[in-house]
């Protein structure tokens, strides 16, 4: 998630956290301090942008302080609705110096075409027609390890909640990997505990199950 999305969902107003692991782990902060920062290399972004423009793919580009999409179609509308997030503003002015994540709204053939000439990125799927492209050295697991190192935590002291394919690497680096009931069977294979769906207060119930809150 982007901080703009957390603000849109009013999560920042409701809860005060010590830090945030944002943009699939590409941008992590503790208070006002940036402790992890991992952008997509420019050489790969140039290749991605070239293919996106040639094929007129709808694609979301995410910077630390803003995000924008090339254009909108039904795939974009459906994918954004599935995560309760508004559609970002449309722009074709892409700043390749400051991109942390790229989200193409395409099928499997499309994503293969987009990354065919890249060397330093990896892909995870979060919707039937939506993917995350992030640095190969980054991701949620790398971010958790950076935060863990910052605080001196051990793996056994860490807990993470997830429900999507793009959460698997994160679940594998914590001592308490918890998967939501709505997660796929593949994701659930990485869990030590299955909690209820998000809509049924699954995270709250999971925290109570492990006696972290009353």
Language model feature labels by segment:
Residues 1-75:
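Active-site phosphate-binding/coordination module
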Residues 15-16, 24, 117-119, 173-174, ...:
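Short, structured coil segments at secondary-structure junctions
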Residues 51, 55-58, 62-170, 182:
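Conserved acidic, metal-coordinating active-site core of Asp-based
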Residues 173, 178-214:
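Asp-based, Mg2+/Mn2+-dependent phosphohydrolase catalytic module
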